[in-house]
């Protein structure tokens, strides 16, 4: 098929070419992420893997499902497609102008248009987009790391940048880069990581252009349509058909916002399934609590909830007939036509009013995954995993032996919920598929020792299938420093399903057994830790599934 073009071919895509295109898209997305991971500088991106790439077509539809990504909508809103040129790179991180795709300011997003020859005029035109965003070390704001737990406005969280053209026809905008690096406590890492993102996306754009040049614009775009249509049909037939028609309600809570005294911040989903409707699944967030004074808000009510639909849709895969089939299902734009989202009025956790702070918005969007799982478990008689809370940021900052400032942050996972067919997974990083930092690396770069990194014994909730275990990590500081934490589930545990018990909550203890022993809350900015003191972190265990008395005796 090499060199064969189908510019005026049939409207139905060649099924063989569809497989070629789908495989190429997945390979390009993986190449972009691999390039970013190998060429970036900061531990948060290079080692913890807190970044993502995505491929979108000219209609702004997400084509790939291996990874979640942001949206192209805000870029095209401010820079019409017709004004774009080969070599352009667009940049933004403004939470309130990102259409819901960017949740907090340290997530810096770059977008590169892909060009190919128009089949009629022969002129180069935009046919797709390569996009990547990563969690950068520091973008300014009140505290190192740009995630102040006591922020009461987004202005305290760092530099906000609306969509701008960062590269123009292959030439970087040095003035914009100077402004961003000047506002960062880690300017060298910021510059290097941004360059890694831009270079990787430009390389991905060249690879995708080659695909269009080889098979023709019309043929490849027909394959895009076929890929998304297949996803829509598979989710309608194999997944949504397992949800009985009816209306179901579930709610859960974030525990605190970092500013007010700990209290419950409600998140509610009313799910309605109507198998006869063109849009069969309705997710209504009415009843979600008012926006918080602290930074746990998430801007979800943009682009008709486009980002949230793709964010929540992976939970639906648990309804697949077998675990093997679940692993085969991707989440791309094909799920969007099947879901309607209804948002409450402005001024809630999901519809905050500018300039409400958002840096700890994981408390809300991660909890929504659990709320959707809970309401689906209710609807399907327990065909859902128990609850899990598998992301939290912890870290230390101070000065090293040379007097230079340092910042170490880590995304620590936890145990996933027990499932109807197996125990939960131990110490996983479901979102955003991140990793813990290697001990050898952190000890060689930062002034502390890792004295323990293992499983938190018995942290998973009991059940016929127990919840996964969390981390038990202990570090001993070699110099005075400050500890930071952005974590929830330190009071309320991950709940079980069908009689399964709750897992153990998150906890941080400084100087355990020592004269200054103290247990910290989940949201902490600058807890002083003296040289020689130990910080003990135990992350959440997942909830159990099923009655513990039904557990196999040899399990």
Language-model segments: which ranges?
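Glycine/proline-enriched, intrinsically flexible loops and inter-domain linkers
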Residues: 2-86, 91-92, 96-121, 126-555
């Amino acid at each position: 098929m090499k060199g064969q073009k189908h510019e005026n071919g049939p409207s139905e895509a060649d099924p063989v070419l569809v497989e070629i295109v789908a495989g190429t898209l997945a390979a390009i997305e993986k190449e972009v992420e691999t390039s970013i991971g190998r060429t970036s500088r900061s531990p948060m991106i290079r080692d913890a893997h807190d970044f993502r790439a995505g491929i979108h077509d000219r209609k702004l539809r997400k084509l790939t499902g291996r990874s979640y990504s942001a949206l192209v909508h805000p870029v095209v809103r401010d820079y019409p497609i017709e004004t774009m040129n080969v070599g352009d790179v667009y940049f933004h991180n403004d939470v309130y102008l990102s259409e819901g795709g960017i949740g907090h300011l340290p997530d810096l997003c770059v977008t590169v248009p892909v060009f190919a020859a128009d089949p009629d005029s022969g002129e180069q035109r935009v046919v797709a987009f390569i996009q990547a965003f990563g969690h950068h070390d520091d973008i300014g704001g009140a505290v190192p790391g740009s995630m102040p737990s006591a922020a009461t406005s987004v202005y305290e969280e760092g530099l906000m940048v609306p969509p701008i053209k960062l590269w123009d026809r292959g030439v970087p905008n040095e003035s914009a880069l100077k402004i961003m690096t000047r506002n960062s406590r880690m300017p060298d890492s910021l510059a290097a990581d941004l360059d890694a993102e831009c270079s990787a996306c430009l390389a991905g754009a060249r690879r995708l252009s080659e695909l269009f040049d080889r098979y023709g614009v019309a043929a490849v775009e027909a394959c895009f349509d076929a890929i998304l249509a297949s996803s829509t049909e598979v989710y309608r037939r194999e997944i949504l058909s397992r949800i009985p028609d009816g209306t179901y309600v579930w709610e859960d809570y974030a525990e605190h916002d970092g500013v007010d005294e700990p209290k419950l911040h409600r998140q509610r989903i009313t799910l309605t399934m109507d198998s006869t409707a063109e849009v069969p699944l309705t997710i209504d967030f009415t009843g979600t609590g008012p926006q918080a004074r602290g930074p746990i808000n998430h801007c979800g009510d943009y682009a008709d909830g486009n980002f949230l639909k793709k964010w929540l849709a992976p939970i639906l895969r648990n309804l697949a007939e077998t675990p093997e089939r679940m692993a085969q299902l991707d989440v791309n734009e094909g799920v969007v036509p099947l879901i309607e989202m209804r948002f409450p009025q402005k001024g809630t956790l999901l519809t905050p009013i500018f300039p409400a702070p958002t840096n700890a918005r994981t408390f809300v969007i991660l909890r929504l995954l659990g709320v959707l799982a809970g309401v689906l478990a209710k609807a399907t008689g327990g065909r859902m995993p128990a609850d899990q809370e598998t992301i939290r940021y912890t870290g230390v900052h101070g000065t090293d032996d040379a007097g230079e400032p340092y910042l170490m942050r880590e995304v620590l996972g936890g145990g996933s919920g027990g499932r109807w067919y197996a125990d939960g997974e131990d110490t996983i990083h479901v979102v955003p598929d991140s990793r813990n930092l290697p001990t050898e690396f952190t000890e060689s770069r930062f002034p502390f020792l890792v004295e323990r990194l293992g499983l938190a014994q018995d942290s998973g909730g009991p059940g016929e299938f127990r919840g996964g275990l969390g981390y038990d990590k202990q570090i001993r500081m070699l110099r005075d420093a400050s500890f930071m934490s952005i974590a929830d589930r330190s009071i309320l545990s991950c709940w079980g399903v069908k009689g399964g018990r709750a897992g153990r909550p998150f906890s941080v203890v400084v100087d355990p057994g020592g004269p200054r022993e103290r247990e910290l809350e989940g949201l902490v900015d600058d807890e002083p830790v003296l040289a020689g003191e130990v910080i003990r972190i135990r992350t959440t265990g997942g909830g159990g599934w099923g009655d513990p008395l039904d557990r196999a005796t040899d399990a």
